[in-house]
UniProtKB/Swiss-Prot annotation:
It comes from Bordetella pertussis (strain Tohama I / ATCC BAA-589 / NCTC 13251). This is Small ribosomal subunit protein uS3. The gene is rpsC. Belongs to the universal ribosomal protein uS3 family. Residues 219-240 have a biased composition (Basic and acidic residues). One of its GO terms (cellular component) is cytosolic small ribosomal subunit. Residues 211-263 are annotated as: Disordered. The lineage of its organism: Bacteria, Pseudomonadati, Pseudomonadota, Betaproteobacteria, Burkholderiales.
Length: 263
């Protein structure tokens, strides 16, 4: 079932944390949850061009603190901070409490699963071939340090009549391993043929229970790896001519000497 379950929900309280961090009683829980959903939908629409990877919402003591992880923080802040002030006013109107907004920069957007999925969906909406978009994203992620990546696209790919699913994988993506740091993201491409769904899994290495990465295991040196098969001319005589009980053929028998003339 590791292939089907949501990778983030599977690892909650083990190596991953919640994106909504607050406590509420039974009466207020539904209202606050609906507010979080509205805030996330608003930020997704408002900051569509800012490459937002994830949003964390915290509610300490009748306040709200929202952390936005973006690959383009300058777009969120705007000139002289005007855009972020307007954003803060809109969020306060949505939530009804004072809101503090923090902007965090994503250092490697090529290895962020949500940003990869959004990038592929934008390319599909511009009529770029889905295979080219998927393979280009995989190459960029592996080049910048990802240990494995898997991308899946579903829908009327290239405008075909019958919807299908195609996926590509490079490297390792251990979905059953709880300590594996799996980043997961989804997106939708609204094309003229219909909606195409994109799912992205990025494996960034193993993670300890406290959220820290373990020391990297030493990779085997080149001379310690399994040697390749030797060329035919460099093999020992036994391997070339065959031995009793082996798979090779036995030594070739010498041709009979020609009979002397006159007999």
């Amino acid at each position: 079932m590791g292939q089907k379950i949501h990778p983030t929900g599977f690892r909650l309280a083990v190596t991953r944390n919640w994106t909504s961090r607050w406590f509420a009683d039974d009466k207020a829980f539904g209202t606050m949850l609906a507010e979080d959903i509205r805030v996330r939908e608003y930020l997704k629409k408002k900051l569509k061009s800012a490459s937002v990877g994830r949003v964390i919402i915290e509610r300490p003591a009748k306040n709200a603190r929202i952390t936005v992880y973006s690959a383009r923080p300058g777009v969120v802040i705007g000139k002289r901070g005007e855009d972020i002030e307007n954003l803060k006013a809109d969020l306060q109107r949505l939530m009804g409490v004072p809101v503090h907004v923090n902007i965090e920069e994503i250092r490697k957007p090529e290895t962020d699963a949500q940003l990869i999925a959004d990038s592929i969906s934008q390319q599909l909406e511009k009529r770029i071939m889905f295979r080219r978009a998927m393979k280009r994203a995989m190459q960029n992620a592996m080049r910048l340090g990802a240990q494995g990546i898997k991308i899946m696209s579903s829908g009327r790919l290239n405008g075909i009549e019958i919807a299908r699913t195609e996926w590509y994988r490079e490297g390792r993506v251990p979905l059953h391993t709880l300590k594996a740091n799996i980043d997961y993201g989804t997106s939708e491409a609204h094309t003229t043929y219909g909606v195409i769904g994109i799912k992205v899994w990025v494996y960034k290495g193993d993670m300890l229970a406290n959220g820290e990465l373990p020391p990297e295991a030493a990779t085997p040196r080149e001379e310690e790896r399994r040697p390749r098969r030797a060329p035919r001319g460099d093999r020992p005589d036994g391997a070339r001519t065959g031995r009793p009980g082996g798979r090779g053929r036995g030594p070739r028998k010498a041709d009979a000497a020609p009979a002397p003339e006159g007999e």
